Amino acid sequence: MKYFEFGKENEELMVLLHGGGTSYLGVLPTAKKIAEKYHVVLLAYDGFNPSEPETEFQSLAYEAQGLEDYLIENYGGKVDILYGLSYGCRTLMQVLEDNRLEITTTIADGMSLRDYPDIKSDFWKEVYLFFFTGTFFVIMGRAGKLRKRFLAKITGRSFEEADRILYTKASWKSWKNQDKCLIGKKTDYSVFENTDMHIWYGIKGTVDKKLSANLEELKAKGYPFTCKIFEDMGHGGLIGENTERFIEEVNAVHPQSKGKTEKRV
């Protein structure tokens, strides 16, 4: 894994976690713009980093542990804003489990509210990965123009954005490991109590509509979080092609989070 940092002269630290099947390049333009106000740490996952093509994605826990240790060693574990997009939300949830960290504001953008199936048999795990992961590997991992147009349609993004953010050189092993490590893992939503939690969905396409299908059920369980739906945005559309709007939304929630943190202290 690799960490790209921008705006080190700024006081507040913002950590960005990009989605699966993409590279850090998808959010790089926004990261650089945000760096005018925040000190930005952008994580590039092993196996999905164009600058380290020889690496393989091992597991979500491995990526999260590396990030946690990096933040503790370099910044004392204090994070002002933690942002995750899509698969990055799963990394984000893992990071929130680390009690060594102090995270003020957390934003999960396009977060799936469904767990992977609990499959015990190694044989059936491989069968599941062959069909489930294999489908996404073909559509996203080796996408040509037609598949990118399809992805743009279902995510509510433009073709140009789909073409820019997809990383088509990751290995099958990296793709498989992304999902394999999550089979049987239950999401612990109680970690919402460790931060001021915000969940965003851009429902212009069909992807976030499906990802948010269990939203009302989650609300009913009483976990502390706020949710905002962007009807005019696609999956990841804010951080992707609407940089100014993204910054506005972040700046709107973070000061409130700081106020809540001060009251807790």
PLM feature segments, named:
Residues 83-92:
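Gly/Ala-rich beta-loop-alpha elbow adjacent to hydrolase catalytic centers
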Residues 1-14, 36-38, 146, 255-265:
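Alpha/beta-hydrolase fold catalytic core
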Residues 42-83:
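Active-site loop/oxyanion-hole signature of alpha/beta-hydrolase fold enzymes
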Residues 97, 103-135:
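Flexible "cap/lid" loop of the alpha/beta hydrolase fold
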Residues 118, 137-191:
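Conserved alpha/beta-hydrolase catalytic His-Asp/Glu region
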Residues 4-52:
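Conserved HGGG/HGGXW glycine-rich cap/lid loop of the alpha/beta-hydrolase fold
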Residues 177-215:
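Conserved serine/cysteine hydrolase catalytic core
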Residues 233-242:
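Catalytic histidine-centered segment of alpha/beta-hydrolase-like enzymes
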